[in-house]
């Protein structure tokens, strides 16, 4: 009988656990199956499979799920970054309009690195709201794009814009009849995202450098410090949990019956 070391046993056990927690929609975020599952053409009249990454601010999609976006794009998916705001409050000492112009250019530069498309919503950084008008705006984008997969913020977060973004997407998911797979991503866990316990991981080791290149496009945000002090350590920590160098972590929310948070009338 072949002897199995404790390390190999743990790694195998981790793999079994990851498989058990794999997505019901053919393991979209299961790193071991990305190259195989995601390279296959869509079953819907040959159209590309589509994912939306919906973030509250410019730089949120790239920092919370940039590696996964790149892997999806490499596998032939159409990926759209949806920015709830233009980052109007994100640069001290200048007007909201000036900040928005700078940060919009940074978003476009980041999307050129990743290859994702981009869309901007009409909310204002630091003053996002939950009402029917803003809910309809998110729902209209989702209905127009018809994604199979949506990634957005984890709802338990110290930043109000992150919470509002998460709730708006959640209600759109419910109203659409759970028509897409919904995943929550973490933002600076322990500082912003709280009580985040992953159900799924993606090994982003092969694309970590490209993810960081996209993040660095957001020059106005002091990204070297943000990456070095928060995001890269978080990627390495999730990598240790998933037995790789760098990983992104997610919570997969499955459809259920629950009251809406948004007024529908």
Regions found by a protein language model. Name each.
Residues 6, 10-19, 30-54, 112, ...:
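Metal-dependent de-N-acetylase/amidase catalytic core
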Residues 59, 85, 107, 118, ...:
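Divalent metal-coordination and catalytic microenvironments
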Residues 94-114:
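Glycine-rich phosphate-binding loop and adjoining beta1-alpha1-beta2 segment
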Residues 79, 118, 180:
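Hydrophobic anchor at the start of a short beta-strand
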Residues 84, 111-126:
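A conserved beta-strand->alpha-helix junction
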Residues 51-58, 62-96:
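ATP-dependent adenylation/pyrophosphate-handling site
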Residues 88-101, 124-129:
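Acidic/histidine-rich helix-loop elements
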Residues 1-4:
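N-terminal secretory signal peptides
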């Amino acid at each position: 009988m072949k002897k199995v070391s404790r390390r190999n046993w743990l790694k195998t056990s981790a793999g079994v656990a990851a498989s058990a927690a794999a997505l019901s929609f053919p393991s979209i975020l299961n790193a071991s199956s990305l190259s195989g599952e995601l390279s296959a053409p869509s079953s819907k009249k040959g159209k590309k499979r589509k994912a939306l990454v919906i973030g509250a601010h410019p730089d949120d999609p790239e920092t919370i799920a940039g590696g996964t976006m790149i892997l999806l794009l490499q596998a032939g998916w159409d990926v759209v970054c949806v920015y709830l705001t233009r980052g109007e409050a994100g640069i001290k000492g200048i007007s909201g309009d000036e900040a928005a112009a700078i940060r919009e250019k940074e978003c476009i530069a980041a999307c050129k690195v990743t290859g994702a498309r981009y869309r901007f919503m009409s909310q204002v950084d630091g003053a996002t709201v939950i009402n029917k008008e803003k809910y309809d705006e998110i729902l209209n984008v989702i209905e127009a794009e018809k994604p199979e997969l949506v990634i957005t913020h984890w709802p338990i977060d110290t930043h109000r814009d992150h919470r509002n973004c998460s709730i708006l997407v959640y209600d759109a998911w419910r109203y659409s009849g759970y028509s897409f797979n919904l995943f929550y991503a973490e933002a600076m866990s322990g500082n912003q995202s709280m009580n985040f316990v992953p159900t799924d991981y993606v090994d982003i080791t092969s694309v970590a450098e490209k993810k960081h290149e996209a993040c660095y496009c957001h020059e106005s945000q002091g990204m070297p410090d943000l990456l070095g002090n928060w995001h890269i350590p978080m990627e390495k920590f999730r990598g240790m949990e998933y037995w790789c160098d760098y990983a992104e972590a997610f919570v997969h929310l499955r459809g259920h019956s629950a009251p809406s948070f948004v007024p529908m009338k």
